């Protein structure tokens, strides 16, 4: 199959169209692609060095690694597993410190995930000053702890990540307690003057879940009562039949005496 190079030559063709006057306006992506042009070499080269760990993947196996301990012989022929394509062409995984801090924080604070999030895409150029935890226009959440930890590491306030994380975490606790206390005071003051608050989205969800649980409990109790009633009726009928038989047996000798 012939290699398709149309997408690679898009910068050259667009430049020709601009010079010839076929395009009146420069595309928005033109300067970006001109600064970072696409790769024109289509041959796959093995990635022998891991960019994250720096480990070299092209080392050959040592002969002692091919020794079979059971037969005391060396493996000299390639098997099916050895003939498989090595992972030298596979791109390395991207690992970031922020992801480790996020997973650690939300593993220790799972209830922070229940707080509502604003799913609005931003421009990515927000300039926050992480010398303090609170930011204008950004709610206090786990991301604040992550960015505050990175700032403490970069500024040199702490050399160890855990120490910086602990300081950011304690600052988060203090601000969260202050925020909850202010919300509680405002709620009590508003209630005192006659304000009525509707249930939140989380409370509404819990109420609907509790209704389902109550209905399930009623069905289970009714089923257990029905099963116990069937068992009792069977035992009672068997007991009545036994009593009637005993009465008949005791009545027959009396009739003979008469």
Swiss-Prot record:
GO terms for cellular component: mitochondrial small ribosomal subunit. GO terms for molecular function: structural constituent of ribosome. Residues 230-239 have a biased composition (Polar residues). Keywords: Mitochondrion, Ribonucleoprotein, Ribosomal protein. Its main location: mitochondrion. It is found in: Mitochondrion. Residues 230-258 are annotated as: Disordered. The keyword Thylakoid does not apply. The keyword S-adenosyl-L-methionine does not apply. Residues 241-258 have a biased composition (Acidic residues). Belongs to the mitochondrion-specific ribosomal protein mS23 family. Component of the mitochondrial small ribosomal subunit. This is Small ribosomal subunit protein mS23. It comes from Eremothecium gossypii (strain ATCC 10895 / CBS 109.51 / FGSC 9923 / NRRL Y-1056) (Yeast).
């Amino acid at each position: 199959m012939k290699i398709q190079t149309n997408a690679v030559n898009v910068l050259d063709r667009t430049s020709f169209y601009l010079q010839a006057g076929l395009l009146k306006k420069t595309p928005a992506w033109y300067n970006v692609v001109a600064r970072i042009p696409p790769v024109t070499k289509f041959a796959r080269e093995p990635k022998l060095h891991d960019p994250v760990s720096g480990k070299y993947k092209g080392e050959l196996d040592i002969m002692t690694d091919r020794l079979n301990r059971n037969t005391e012989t060396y493996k000299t022929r390639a098997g099916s597993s050895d003939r498989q394509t090595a992972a030298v062409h596979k791109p390395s995984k991207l690992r970031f410190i922020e992801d480790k801090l996020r997973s650690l924080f939300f593993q220790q604070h799972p209830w922070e995930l229940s707080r509502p999030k604003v799913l609005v895409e931003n421009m990515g150029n927000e300039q926050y000053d992480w010398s303090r935890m609170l930011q204008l226009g950004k709610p206090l959440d786990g991301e604040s702890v992550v960015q505050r930890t990175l700032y403490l590491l970069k500024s040199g306030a702490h050399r160890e990540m855990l120490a910086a994380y602990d300081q950011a975490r304690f600052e988060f606790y203090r601000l969260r307690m202050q925020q909850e206390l202010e919300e509680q005071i405002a709620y009590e003051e508003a209630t005192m003057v006659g304000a009525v608050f509707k249930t939140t989205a989380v409370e509404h969800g819990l109420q609907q879940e509790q209704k389902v649980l109550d209905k399930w409990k009623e069905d289970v109790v009714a089923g257990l009562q029905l099963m116990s009633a069937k068992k009792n009726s069977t035992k009672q009928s068997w007991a009545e039949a036994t009593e009637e038989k005993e009465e008949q047996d005791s009545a027959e000798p009396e009739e003979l005496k008469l």
